[in-house]
């Protein structure tokens, strides 16, 4: 067994020392994110909560019976400059915000050029907008970055402090690598910026806030920033970075945090040396205590060398959920398999034996660019106590599904049921949606699955001209997005937005709160759908 090995470094940003803000007791063990304690219908972080389960529990008005009556409630064109293929991040929805002379449920849209917009969630009226000023001593680069991989953009979905916090703030990690603390009422910075990444343009992913510590991961070595797990303690003002640097960590929802405070993420392909902590193509678990990150456990597939050679990263944010008295995780990646892991022992004594390594569900073509699983997953429990796993997938399926809704050559959403199989578990194929071009991570609410077919052209290698497609070429080849509502038990399409949305989106996703669905697209337009 590995045991608990410490692979971390801790530092205080220089500007904090200059402000005399150093000091304060070290934080104790970080544990127990709120177990779905919210009573208002909000969406405060990527995938809705710290567990990254994509399940909106506070929903009652939209049902499978009336979802066909969904309508566009409003759309608003915002002034927001795109960077590469990036426009808006996943929207955040916050209730009871006093702003612009009233009290509102606010929809927060963070744009690629470090702009943040707060809108009235009921009408689409802009309440405030801000463009966060550059704070790094490294000057900003001209242009939009290196292709579609390393873009000079705000890339991490922000996070809002929980509903029971004494003072609620919005936290945004801008492209200069600095964490911003934003007053929800005005959009003004409430505290000085805190450096979280060593250099600008590090390509971080969804921020997770648990017990006053903000976590993120970075992917693909962009901007010269090491791929690592980052923890910024809002109490002690200390930054901790996991060591050694890893392969790319690029599940779009960032790290997931379990009930005991353990932080989980998946790593992409790269050099592998378990003895030194270099764990490419693996699922990893870290603890955070006394401003120290400690590697707790990991799972590495037995075919990880082949996966690395074929560029089949484990690249999805895992989802955490309770099952039969245990806390489990489900992860996936480009290969098209799913991994179900016990949080107490991800890969068993040999770190290679999870509860389940599924058969190949997709990507029969061993395609590193458009097939398999990308982004993040969702999971929920139906009234009959069945545990469901939902996943976006690309390309044709590799296993038969008992319920289908026509050919799906581009993929879509697949649903699986988790069942006991002796002392193990199994995933049973349940349904596959109709064909969707680049399905984004789904959200489940009140028996309805909401999903965006993003329309993005995801090809990477230009087989005709050589090299990689540029961001501009991928944008040109992308198609308009579509919003779908599906019956969560059968996958039947209950609603489609048809041709109402003229633009596409890239790794943005949607939010569901207050029985409304929110998202933004590449052309600068943000939308709300719901029942009138």
Role assignments for model-derived ranges:
Residues 36-39, 532:
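Low-complexity, Pro/Thr/Ser/Gly/Ala-rich linker/spacer regions in secreted
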Residues 16-28:
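Bacterial N-terminal signal peptides
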């Amino acid at each position: 067994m590995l045991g608990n090995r410490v692979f971390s470094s801790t530092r205080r940003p220089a500007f904090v020392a200059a402000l005399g803000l150093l000091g304060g007791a070290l934080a104790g063990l970080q544990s127990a994110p709120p177990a779905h304690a919210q009573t208002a219908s909000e969406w405060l972080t990527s995938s809705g909560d710290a567990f990254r389960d994509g399940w909106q529990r506070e929903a009652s008005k939209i049902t499978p019976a009336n979802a066909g009556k969904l309508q566009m409630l409003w759309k608003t064109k915002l002034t927001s400059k795109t960077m590469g293929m990036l426009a808006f991040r996943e929207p955040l929805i916050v209730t009871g915000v006093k702003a612009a002379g009233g009290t509102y449920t606010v929809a927060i849209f963070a744009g690629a050029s470090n702009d943040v917009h707060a809108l009235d969630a009921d009408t689409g009226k802009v309440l405030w907008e801000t463009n966060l000023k550059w704070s790094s001593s490294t000057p900003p680069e001209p242009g939009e970055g290196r292709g579609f991989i390393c873009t000079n953009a705000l890339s991490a979905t922000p996070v809002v402090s929980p509903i029971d916090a004494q003072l609620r703030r919005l936290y945004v990690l801008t492209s200069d690598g600095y964490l911003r603390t934003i007053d929800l009422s005005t959009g003004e910075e409430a505290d000085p910026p805190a450096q979280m990444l060593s250099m600008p343009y590090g390509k971080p992913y969804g921020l997770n806030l648990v017990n006053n510590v903000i976590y993120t991961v970075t992917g693909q070595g962009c901007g010269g920033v090491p791929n690592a797990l980052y923890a910024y303690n809002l109490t002690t003002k200390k930054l901790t970075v996991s060591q050694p640097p890893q392969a790319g960590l690029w599940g779009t929802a960032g790290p997931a945090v379990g009930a005991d405070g353990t932080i989980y993420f998946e790593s992409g392909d790269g050099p592998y040396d378990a003895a030194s902590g270099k764990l490419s193509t693996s699922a990893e678990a870290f603890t955070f205590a006394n401003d120290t990150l400690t590697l707790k456990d990991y799972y590495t597939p037995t075919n990880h060398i082949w996966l690395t050679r074929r560029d089949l990263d484990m690249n999805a944010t895992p989802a955490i959920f309770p099952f039969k008295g245990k806390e489990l995780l489900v992860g996936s990646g480009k290969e098209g398999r799913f991994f179900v892991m016990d949080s107490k022992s991800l890969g068993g004594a040999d770190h290679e034996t999870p509860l389940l390594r599924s058969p190949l569900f997709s990507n029969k073509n061993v395609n590193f660019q458009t097939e398999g699983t990308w982004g993040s997953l969702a999971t929920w429990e139906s009234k009959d106590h069945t545990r469901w796993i939902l996943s976006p997938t690309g390309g044709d399926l590799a296993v038969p599904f008992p319920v289908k809704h026509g050919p799906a050559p581009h993929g879509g959403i697949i649903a699986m049921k988790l069942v006991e199989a002796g002392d193990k578990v199994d995933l049973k194929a349940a349904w596959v949606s109709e064909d969707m071009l680049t399905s984004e991570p789904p959200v489940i609410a009140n028996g309805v699955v909401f999903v965006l077919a993003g329309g993005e052209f995801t090809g990477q290698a230009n087989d005709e001209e050589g090299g990689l497609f540029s961001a501009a070429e991928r944008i040109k080849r992308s198609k308009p997005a579509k919003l779908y509502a599906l019956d969560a038990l059968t996958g039947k399409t209950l609603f489609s937005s048809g041709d109402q949305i003229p633009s596409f989106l890239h790794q943005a996703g949607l939010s569901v709160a207050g029985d409304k669905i929110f998202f933004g697209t590449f052309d600068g337009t943000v939308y709300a759908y719901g029942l009138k």
